[in-house]
Curated annotation (Swiss-Prot):
Record's keyword terms, sorted: Cell membrane, Cell projection, Cytoplasm, Developmental protein, Guanine-nucleotide releasing factor, Membrane, Repeat, Synapse, Synaptosome
Role: Functions as a guanine nucleotide exchange factor for RAC1. Plays a role in semaphorin signaling via its interaction with PLXNA4. Plays a role in the assembly and disassembly of dendritic filopodia, the formation of dendritic spines, regulation of dendrite length and ultimately the formation of synapses.
Compartments it resides in: Cell membrane; Synapse; Synapse, Synaptosome; Cytoplasm, Cytosol
Listed Polar residues bias regions: 458-513
Residue stretches making up the FERM domain: 40-320
Subunit description: Interacts with PLXNA4.
InterPro entries: Band_41_domain, DBL_dom_sf, DH_dom, Ez/rad/moesin-like, FA, FARP1/FARP2/FRMD7_FERM_C, FERM/acyl-CoA-bd_prot_sf, FERM_2
Species name: Gallus gallus
Record protein name field: FERM, ARHGEF and pleckstrin domain-containing protein 1
GO cellular component terms, A-Z: cytoplasmic side of plasma membrane; cytoskeleton; cytosol; dendrite; dendritic spine; filopodium
Predominant subcellular localization, coarse grouping: membrane
């Protein structure tokens, strides 16, 4: 008998070895028996556009077919993929892994099932297998061709250039043109061919695996990456598109994202006929709940989208597959659906624990001409990815009419699954089909693997094209406060850049880094590297003081560039600013930027000599910094004329904004750019604040040196020079700080006129509860030297705070009301026309308010100036002076439902006002003054939550917030962590950190560990962070700074 010729399988075409299958059953369990019955042939279209035929029993569940395809491809991380097919109504649906195949695919002979990517992780570095990344790259290629992945021409050309590099290797103009002529990656490709080849020329030496990685790195930053749009209408009948992603449910208008609902804020998903319903969790301090409603084309279409949402939530948010609920004995109401398969957490854990063997494979396009690929071994560079934090939340699914809503697994429940390898024996489950396909006559054990974890919000920031995973967070996309709070806005994010609760406009919780931190493998330091680091650099305190000058100077230069480069460039493109104002701003900032560029260069050269990186033979004479500081501080005195102009610049810019709607819109839009990570007018104060930092550094250096030290004389002279400069400019700086703060608060408030008037000074802002007819209601209070405002956070597109009322301080009295009203930490503020009752969250908080309000009352008594009309539309107040009834106020603005078209707030969500609202705390002007003094920049290592890896980040601490960058060269932060409300401690022995110079940040359930490089830097980080995490006492503030004259 002649032997039957063996056709290559889909896996062998990719070069994969036959896989016996990997068992993921618990110990003692047996694989399910394959249901008997007639075999049916199913045609599967692979991602490389080839077709394979599989034969499965009619009654076999969908999981048997899915596992057969994964085994056929030798695909370990098969859980990211799914089988998609058109149902009897020609609607594309996913194969249900629990239902019999025949009940879903009713006419298998006439249906082609597509094997495609179903779950797109926030960061492709979480994909451990090169084969998996290759299949993801094929999906990107397919989405480009089909018009699903939309982007600008430059991004499109860059994506295609990496595909071409992966397929044919290094650039050759003739071969490139021939290849592009034969292969159409997008419609109308001809217009981009020159740009594609221009990018391809830069990829010389890049292996196919690296090209795949870079392709996914670029693709994941695109807004439409992994997005499948589902047409719908909102309550007003406006046509929109819904989509689901790893972060939550997204709303699009066309191809533009206009809103997003993070999983952490979604309480329940359901559908009722054609209506898709999203029930949001209420805010912490309010009882109302939002329910958003969308109308879809049909009940089947609506149910299909609901099932996809359930699967995405379970895969990305749960720790383990949800357990099936017992079926009701008599009646069942509504639809029920359960996610079947491994969650991403389980996939990550399995791969991390080494529950698979690396598979070498060859690609469909193997004729490549890469310099490196001729000798390179199969890429293992992305084999391990450090863990990020992973969170789950209680979440209900169900038809709105059913009582059996499926609850998610308990938050925080860790899976400890024992996985057993079945060995390398040949699996009997896959046999050759007479129709040149594969048939299944035995149970196929799913080749499900797990990869390590980090469900991070995808970040839309630009990053260097390297292996950069995405909070915080929050970290997020847009900076949403995710608590490191590293998103939302958004945060990243985030990746899990979200390290803590999001303080986004919608309070979308992910975690507190605003946008996701990166889990780049290249960020992890080994112990050997640490030892080299310790041996290489000096250890004396003076060196680290000098290094602090350099690190903070880098940040100061970046802040200057926001004005001299980014703002100036934007202004030049828009005709919105008078020439006189342009000249005033840039003629006084450009000399500063030029001077400090040279200053930084000198400092870095001195540090290089000190460290022995150059001219080591003369190193001994350069272990000092005082002479460099003295020379440059004397040079700064020549620039004092420009510093005096900054008060005028700030005033004229705000006047211009007040008088020109066009300039106001321009500045507001500029503040939304990622590079403008603080309010615009804050950058105008940076030069004066920098002088104060020089003074502090020189004081620290002089205190460290003994009088006979070679550097002491120059250091003391430099301190005298900078002290003289500060004395001249200090009064001007105090006025500018108050003026800037009033204008910043003005942007956060609506319903108020004349907030900024001569003589008015800001004292404190914060969250208090106000007693009204509906009970205690959270309100935001703003205390000035003549008036007290109370507001609520509105649901407007700008996310501002709406003013409800104001109390003049003249004649006001404060009464303790805890016993009268039975509310802890409660007091009555009794004004001449109105009285209100307020309560704080803690005794310390109410004491700070009492102290500051009493001080403000005393100041108001001394002033004879009347309080001007503040509210834009003040209703008549008929209350008598002695009336003590609780003030009634409308809650309509709080309970108004939002529509799907309400864009995520263009207003920055991580301002101090919003952080205080979410953290239920307060800050004073003295706290702001202390924050100005306590600014720091430098490298820190952040510990990954569930591994021993440490990630190196460039961190800038300013304005009560840590901003995280990949390196000091980045133009904008990737994530942020507001620290108000956090506690700062040193890890205990039980936390098993086992490293020096580690500090711990903790807020509720959010914990982060950071590690400094030396004892000095550790103490400095502890000092500056403690200024934000600790309540600022007035006595401490006055010891640091001259009292503010109100």
């Amino acid at each position: 008998m002649g032997e039957t010729e063996q056709r290559p399988t889909a896996g062998s075409r990719l070069g994969a070895q036959e896989n016996a299958g990997i068992s993921t059953l618990e110990h003692g369990q047996k694989p399910p028996l394959t249901p008997p019955g007639k075999l049916i042939s199913i045609k599967i279209q692979m991602l490389d556009d080839t077709q394979e035929t599989f034969e499965v029993p009619q009654r076999a569940p969908g999981k048997v077919l899915h596992d057969a395809v994964c085994n056929h491809l030798n695909l370990v991380e098969g859980d990211y993929f799914g089988l998609e097919f058109p149902d009897h109504k020609k609607m594309m649906v996913w194969l249900d892994l629990l239902k019999p195949v025949m009940k879903q695919i009713r006419r298998p002979k006439h249906v082609v099932v597509k094997f495609v990517v179903k779950f797109f992780p926030p960061d492709h570095a979480q994909l451990q297998e090169e084969l998996t990344r290759y299949l993801f790259a094929l999906q990107v290629k397919q989405d480009l061709a089909q018009g699903r992945l939309t982007c600008n021409d430059t991004s499109t050309a860059l994506l295609i250039s990496h595909i071409v590099q992966s397929e044919i290797g290094d650039f050759d103009e003739t071969i490139d043109r021939e290849h592009l002529a034969k292969n159409k990656y997008i419609p109308q490709q001809e217009a981009l061919e020159d740009k594609i080849m221009e990018f391809h020329r830069k990829h010389t030496g890049q292996t196919p695996a690296e090209s795949d990685f870079q392709l996914l790195e670029i693709a994941r930053r695109l807004e439409m990456y992994g997005i499948r749009l589902h047409p719908a209408k909102d309550r007003e009948g406006t046509k929109i598109n819904l989509a689901v992603a790893n972060t939550g449910i997204l709303v699009f208008q066309g191809h533009t994202k206009i809103n997003a609902f993070n999983w952490a804020k979604v309480r329940k998903l359901s559908f009722k006929r054609k209506r898709f319903l999203i029930k949001l969790r209420p805010d912490v301090n309010s009882s109302f709940q939002d329910t958003l409603e969308f109308l879809m084309a049909s009940r089947d279409f609506c149910k299909s989208f609901w099932k996809i949402c359930v699967e995405h939530h379970a895969f990305f948010r749960l720790f383990e597959e949800p357990k099936p609920k017992p079926k009701p004995v008599l009646f069942s109401r509504g639809s029920s659906f359960r996610f079947s398969g491994r969650t991403q957490k389980q996939v990550l854990d399995y791969v991390k624990e080494g529950g698979h063997k690396k598979v070498q494979f060859e690609r469909k396009h193997s004729k490549i001409r890469s310099i490196r690929s001729l000798t390179a071994q199969p890429s293992e560079q992305h084999a391990e990815v450090p863990k990020q934090s992973f969170q789950s939340s209680s979440f209900a699914y169900g038809d709105d009419s059913d009582a059996a809503a499926v609850q998610s697994c308990q938050q925080g429940k860790e899976l400890k699954a024992s996985t057993e390898d079945t060995g390398q024996h040949k699996s009997p489950s896959l046999k050759k089909s007479p129709k040149e396909g594969r048939k299944v006559d035995g149970a196929v054990v799913s080749a499900v693997e797990e990869e390590e974890e980090a469900a991070t919000d995808r970040m839309q920031q630009n990053r260097p094209q390297s292996q950069q995973p995405s909070t915080a967070g929050s970290l997020t996309g847009s900076p949403h406060l995710s608590e490191l709070s590293i998103n939302s806005q958004g945060g990243p994010s985030v990746a899990n850049m979200s390290l803590s609760p999001n303080l986004s406009p919608d309070a979308k919780q992910s975690s507190p880094l605003i946008s996701p931190l990166l889990n780049d493998p290249s960020c992890i330091r080994t112990e050997e590297e640490e030892e080299v680091k310790k041996k290489r650099f000096p250890t004396e305190k003076a060196y680290f003081i000098a290094k602090e000058v350099a690190t903070t100077e880098r940040t100061y230069l970046k802040d200057l560039e926001v004005i001299t480069s980014w703002f100036q460039s934007a202004v030049s493109k828009e005709d919105c600013m008078p020439e006189t104002l342009k000249n005033l701003i840039f003629s006084n900032f450009e000399p500063l930027h030029k001077f400090h560029t040279g200053f930084l260069k000198e400092i870095e050269q001195r540090l290089a000599l000190w460290e022995g990186r150059s001219n080591a033979h003369i190193k001994g004479g350069h272990q000092r910094i005082g002479d460099v500081m003295l020379k440059n501080i004397q040079g700064m005195k020549q620039l004092t004329i420009h510093l005096w102009k900054h008060n005028e610049i700030l005033t004229e810019l705000e006047n211009g904004i007040k008088n020109s709607r066009k300039l106001e819109t321009f500045c507001r839009d500029f503040e939304l750019q990622k590079v403008c990570y603080l309010p615009l007018n804050t950058f105008l104060l940076r030069p004066l604040h920098r002088l104060m930092h020089y003074k502090q550094i020189m004081e620290r250096l002089c205190k460290h040196y003994p009088p006979n030290h070679v550097d002491f004389r120059d250091s003391r002279a430099a301190l005298a020079e900078i002290t003289e400069m500060m004395a001249q400019l200090h009064g001007n700086m105090i006025k500018m700080e108050n003026f800037q703060k009033l204008h910043e608060l003005k942007k956060d408030l609506i319903g108020i006129d004349n907030l900024v008037i001569p003589g008015r000074e800001f004292i404190r802002l914060g969250s208090l509860s106000k007693l009204s007819g509906k009970g205690l209601q959270q309100r935001m209070f703003f205390l000035f030297n003549d008036i007290l405002l109370y507001t609520s956070r509105g649901l407007t597109a700008s996310n501002q705070f709406k003013v409800h009322g104001h109390l003049p301080l003249y004649g006001m009295t404060i009464e303790d009301s805890e016993e009268e009203w039975g509310v802890p930490h409660c007091l009555t503020l009794r004004g001449q026309q109105q009285s209100i009752i307020v309560a704080a969250s803690t005794r310390a908080e109410i004491d700070k308010w009492i102290e500051d309000i009493q001080m403000a009352i005393d100041l108001a008594e001394k002033s004879s100036d009347p309080v001007p009309e503040l509210l834009a539309s003040s209703p008549p107040d008929n209350k008598s002076p002695d009336e003590t009834t609780v003030d009634q106020e409308s809650e309509d603005d709080l309970s108004a439902s939002r529509t799907s078209l309400e864009r995520q707030s263009p207003h920055r969500g991580n301002t101090t006002v919003h952080v205080c609202w979410h953290r239920n705390t307060s800050v004073s002007m003295i706290d702001f003054s202390i924050a100005v003094e306590n600014q720091l920049s430098g490298n820190l290592l952040r510990k990954f939550k569930n591994s021993n890896g440490w990630q190196k980040l460039w961190v800038v601490f300013t304005n009560f917030c840590m901003f995280f960058y990949k390196s000091h060269q980045d133009n904008h932060p990737l994530a942020s962590l507001p620290l108000l409300g956090y506690s700062l401690t040193i890890p205990s022995e039980s936390e098993n950190i086992h490293k020096d110079y580690v500090f711990k940040l903790h807020f509720k359930s959010h914990v982060y560990y950071f590690r400094a490089e030396s004892e000095y830097t550790f103490e400095r980080w502890m000092e500056v962070i403690r200024s934000a995490t600790s309540s600022a006492l007035r006595t401490r503030a006055l010891s640091h700074r001259e009292p503010h004259t109100y």
